[in-house]
Regions:
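Extracytoplasmic
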Residues: 438-520, 532
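Membrane-interface coil-to-helix junctions
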Residues: 18-115, 144, 157-158, 277-281
């Protein structure tokens, strides 16, 4: 009977996830040839990365892309094209050829919702909850606002909707906390998946992986140096494999040097951001918090989730129930993650100075580790805290300034609250969770309008890549490559679309990471070629309308081998 109830809970979660997907996003985005909703900001970058990768023969490293963002090239990682899925699609195209370009973002969103529900259900069932309360708690996780916010913000980022990886990692942590069980194979699979989806999700997963690893090391009765070498010996094989995978997928494909880290989350964790509704709340109670942009962290959890966390925390630990008390370590570790990985901590919209934030990280990290394991001497704790803080600050803005690590705290807080309520309420847990689900649904109703406006409807006639007759008539004869001259952020999207349609290399364009020194040298050389009219055969240059170009425009026009076409906000410079 219990197996039947579990099967019904699984079917219920899958049905709810599919229904929510249809209501919020619509089945129209599952059409692989429907691309009209992707041609903006980060989604466009991932779309172009995937399709340029499909155009090229597979070469080493597997995730590298040479014809997109020329002359340096890029990779699946730095276009956020979900490397594992892109490789799967490329293998599928080899076996069963199909027309490209295509998009997989719609299917990725659906898979994320389904796995979010399944991993949430698995977590609660694994911790001894009955199927019905596990099902109800999973519904809140599927409708988690911070998850769906990734699809409707000003620059959508569908790759980061893989929150199921955080839930899977938290489930493994709970397995260690309650049963002292460490499944190395499960962790290895999880880390391998996350490194081939997105760097942020990998770091979050790896951070949670360190909890049982470090705690097991601390429990050994040996010297600090002996513990360190044992830890190094046990973890080196997995770290070596992950490093090899990172190389294969293109993590190191972009040259080092003066590289931009933009696109990897220049955000801060605001301590009240979990109350910031961003207009998603139906209660109106948190409207005064609106306007705290770029402070992700919790985002807004929803009134149902906030109430459940409040009720769970107010019930207090149960006497003589050590596992419940031990579970407090999870939100403590989440706090460590926030303060150790964010140098910009906000309070009511005001960001603390980097130095003060670093001191706060150091103190909280020491206090948290001492709280978890009082047997630790102060010296190694301070050493660990100082080393972590120093390394993170040396890593630059890629990690230290992101408030997205607050996602861990949001999930950990809710999970801890549900497990706490299980012991307090017992049979009354299901009615209470049902009430919280209804409150959550009522509060988040305005979110529907935000999402619906961002996604295409099934009755829209236009779905593929837009044609551009003006570019078609200008590009004669057909060029061999297209170069873009201008500022860092200058990228004419219609030109990149045209280049993809005609299988032409294009670049350089703005991507999350590029070598500024190499780009600057390339731009200077390109500018000299523009002034002298020295275009190579089959080359087209899209030049941004800058003051410098306007001053020298007549000089460029005098070159007999060059013709200039005004495209509105840029010039096309072509050979005659």
């Amino acid at each position: 009977m219990r197996t039947l109830h579990r099967s019904m809970a699984v079917c219920g979660v899958l049905a709810f996830s599919t229904w929510l997907f249809s209501v919020l996003y619509g089945f129209a985005i599952l059409d692989p040839h429907r691309m009209d909703w992707l041609l903006q900001e980060d989604p466009a970058q991932a779309f172009f990365g995937l399709n340029y990768f499909l155009l090229e023969p597979l070469h080493w490293p597997w995730g590298s892309i040479s014809t997109f963002n020329i002359p340096t090239g890029t990779s699946l990682v730095f276009t956020d094209a979900i490397p594992w899925l892109s490789l799967l699609v490329k293998c599928g195209k080899t076996l069963i050829p199909f027309d490209s370009p295509i998009q997989i973002s719609g299917w990725w969103i659906l898979v994320c919702l389904l796995l979010q529900g399944l991993f949430g259900l698995r977590l609660f069932l694994r911790e001894g909850l009955a199927p019905l309360p596990s099902f109800l708690a999973s519904l809140i996780l599927v409708a988690w606002p911070a998850l769906h916010f990734r699809s409707i913000e000003e620059t959508p980022h569908y790759t980061l909707m893989g929150h199921f990886l955080i839930l899977a990692a938290l489930s493994c942590v709970l397995d260690w906390v309650f049963r002292h069980r460490f499944n190395r194979i499960e962790w290895a699979i999880l880390l391998t998946l996350s490194i081939g989806i997105h760097f942020y999700l990998f770091v979050m997963t790896f951070l949670l992986y360190t909890i049982p690893i470090l705690e097991a090391s601390w429990e050994r009765e040996s010297s600090l140096s002996h513990r360190f070498f044992q830890l190094l010996r046990s973890e080196t094989p997995l770290l070596a494999i992950l490093g090899g995978l990172a190389y294969c997928l293109g993590y190191f494909e972009v040259p080092a040097g003066d590289s931009s880290s933009a696109g990897f989350g220049l955000f801060s964790m605001d301590l009240i951001s979990f109350l910031n509704s961003e207009g998603f709340s139906g209660t109106g109670a948190f409207e005064f918090m609106r306007g705290l942009k770029s402070r992700e962290g919790f985002q807004y959890l929803g009134l149902g989730a906030i109430l459940s966390i409040g009720i769970g925390l107010s019930s207090g630990p149960i006497r003589n129930l050590r596992p419940t008390i031990m579970a407090i370590r999870i939100p403590v570790i989440a706090f460590i993650a926030i303060f150790a990985l964010s140098s910009r901590i906000g309070i009511f919209g005001h960001t603390l100075p980097v130095f003060l934030s670093g001191v706060l990280e150091f103190v909280l990290f020491c206090m948290a580790l001492r709280r978890m394991n009082p047997s630790l001497s102060l010296l190694p704790v301070m050493f660990l805290a100082g080393a972590l803080t120093g390394l993170v600050h040396l890593a630059g803005p890629t990690l230290r300034s992101s408030g997205r690590f607050g996602w861990i705290l949001g999930y950990a807080g809710f999970i801890f609250a549900v497990l706490q309520l299980r012991h307090r309420l017992q049979r009354a847990l299901s009615p209470v969770l049902l009430g919280l689900v209804l409150i959550q649904a009522w509060d988040l109703a305005p979110l529907l309008d935000h999402v619906k406006r961002a996604f295409p409807k099934s009755d829209m006639s236009h779905s593929g890549l837009p044609s551009n007759p003006q570019l078609d008539s200008s590009m004669h004869p057909k060029p061999l490559r297209i170069l873009i001259y201008g500022s860092e952020y200058f990228t004419p999207p219609e030109l990149v679309v045209w280049a993809l349609q005609h299988h032409l290399p294009v670049g350089p364009i703005y991507l999350p990471r590029f070598d500024r020194n190499r780009r600057q040298a390339f731009m200077e050389a390109l500018w000299q070629r523009i002034l002298k009219g020295r275009l190579m055969a089959g080359e087209v240059i899209a030049a941004e309308k800058t003051e410098e170009l306007r001053e020298h425009l007549e000089e460029v026009r005098k070159n007999p081998g060059v013709r200039i076409k005004d495209m509105g906000h840029y010039y096309l410079i072509l050979t005659r």
